[in-house]
């Protein structure tokens, strides 16, 4: 998280956006102040950097324009540890997919929880960017919601344009809807 945040600070993002980062061991007051930044709607785009699977990945509701996108870096795989390896070995002995139960499923659960922060009501609109080639693997795609079957595989060269086209197309749809 620190290195990604550092790169953002050095990029053009810092010139056009406000950047905030989740701090380790945030107390309740700091967490509320962090979330309030999203609700303020200051006019300048806000980009928040959070740890996948942390306190901000579930149990928060930022509806409307408070949160219009999430960029998830990595598939959320847990660290290799004795507990995970025991789970893996158990399911492997059962002729089941030990790696999936120990690592893939918990990781993808974190991804889905974080992505679920974007669309909280029927009126919410937003983008979910999954930044890792592993999301294109069949085993990972099979764990994503059916509604996500329409997606774009982008890279750093065309990501901005695809997002711009999405939001411009959305605006055009609203105009056409209002005219009819």
Specify the residue positions occupied by each region the protein language model found:
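ASCE RecA-like P-loop NTPase motor cores
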Residues: 1-180
